[in-house]
């Protein structure tokens, strides 16, 4: 009887165009090991899927880890309702293409109260539509482990987070109460109600991610590549101005130029950069001389002192 799964799901994710260089191969092996360890140790793992480049690499590694079987856990997308339209289209196509079990969660309280980044500010919006929403989804699914795509090179609080990041029953993170990790040995013992966030990409850098995408021919949301796009300058960021919900403030004008995004999130809170990089090779060359973190383009990382660590302590990704 013919297999009814989508044809692309049957393709072998292990067949790269050319052998990986030793550095990328070592990173890949470590990530696959982490995926398999968590899947073996925990009863109900889930993968947090935010649709960006790191999530795309994470998904590719998960497919490799369990090939020729399907990815043995669901993907969870915490949707705020303010993602770039291109991200949602890419998410839906990816789920169909690889026959994924995709869970979408939107905070019902936030939706009912019409919480937006414009009316409530980035801090309150993120707390309600991301952190609170994520806690709701994890509780509803009774998940005891959640894979995330965070990397230590992204931001200071993430630099000190373990690969197995332990969370209390209310999903809080205490950086002073984490377990040592010797070599590739991880202690996944938890009490009832506790959970773990596992980060297979912890030791990767932004350039590693892009070189791996190039080597493995991993598809991405087109927003990562430069193109003439409309934008407005607001709070020191270039905000995409192609969504009708974006209202211009006094003195603002729509501009057009070659821009791209190093990081993707909610469009009103994510700044673009001026760029001519339209190909993978050009993006990598651009990153090799970059002097600031990709997270500089996220308003939520600078809306208050110690912003990211505070959010993570409260249960953020």
Swiss-Prot record:
Spans annotated as Disordered: 1-21, 298-317
Pfam family, one: PAPS_reduct
Pathway entry: Sulfur metabolism; hydrogen sulfide biosynthesis; sulfite from sulfate: step 1/3
Catalytic reaction list: sulfate + ATP + H(+) = adenosine 5'-phosphosulfate + diphosphate
Lineage, opening ranks: Bacteria, Pseudomonadati, Pseudomonadota, Alphaproteobacteria, Hyphomicrobiales
Enzyme category, top tier: transferase
Keywords in alphabetical order: ATP-binding, Nucleotide-binding, Nucleotidyltransferase, Transferase
Function: With CysN forms the ATP sulfurylase (ATPS) that catalyzes the adenylation of sulfate producing adenosine 5'-phosphosulfate (APS) and diphosphate, the first enzymatic step in sulfur assimilation pathway. APS synthesis involves the formation of a high-energy phosphoric-sulfuric acid anhydride bond driven by GTP hydrolysis by CysN coupled to ATP hydrolysis by CysD.
Keyword Iron-sulfur in annotation: no
Oligomeric and partner information: Heterodimer composed of CysD, the smaller subunit, and CysN.
Protein name: Sulfate adenylyltransferase subunit 2
BP terms from Gene Ontology: hydrogen sulfide biosynthetic process; sulfate assimilation
Protein EC: 2.7.7.4
Similarity annotation: Belongs to the PAPS reductase family. CysD subfamily.
Single GO term (MF): sulfate adenylyltransferase (ATP) activity
């Amino acid at each position: 009887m013919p297999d009814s799964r989508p044809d692309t799901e049957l393709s072998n994710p292990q067949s790269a165009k050319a052998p990986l260089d030793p550095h990328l191969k070592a990173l890949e092996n470590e990530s696959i090991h982490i995926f398999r360890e968590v899947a073996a140790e925990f009863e109900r793992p889930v993968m947090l899927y935010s649709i960006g480049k790191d999530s795309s690499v994470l998904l590719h590694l998960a497919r490799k880890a369990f090939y020729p079987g399907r990815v043995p856990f669901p993907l969870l997308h915490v949707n705020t309702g303010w993602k770039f339209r291109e991200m949602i289209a890419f998410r839906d196509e990816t789920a169909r293409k690889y026959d994924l079990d995709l869970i979408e969660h939107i905070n019902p309280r936030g939706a009912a109260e019409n919480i937006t980044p414009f009316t409530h500010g980035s801090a309150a919006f993120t707390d309600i539509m991301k952190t609170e929403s994520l806690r709701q989804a994890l509780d509803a699914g009774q998940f005891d482990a959640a894979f995330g795509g965070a990397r230590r090179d992204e931001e200071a609080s993430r630099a000190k987070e373990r690969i197995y990041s332990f969370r209390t029953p209310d999903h809080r993170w205490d950086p002073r109460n984490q377990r040592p990790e010797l070599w590739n040995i991880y202690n996944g013992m938890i009490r009832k109600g506790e959970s773990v966030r596992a980060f297979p990409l912890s030791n990767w850098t932004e350039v590693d991610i892009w070189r791996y995408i190039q080597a493995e021919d991993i598809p991405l949301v087109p927003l990562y590549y430069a193109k003439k796009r409309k934008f407005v300058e607001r709070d020191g960021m270039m905000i995409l101005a192609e969504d009708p919900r974006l209202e211009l403030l006094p003195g603002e004008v729509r501009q057009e130029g070659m821009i791209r995004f190093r990081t993707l999130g909610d469009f009103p809170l994510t700044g673009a950069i001026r760029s001519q990089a339209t190909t993978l090779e050009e993006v990598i060359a651009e990153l090799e001389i970059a002097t600031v973190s990709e997270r500089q383009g996220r308003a939520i990382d600078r809306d208050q002192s110690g912003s990211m660590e505070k959010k993570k302590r409260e249960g953020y990704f």
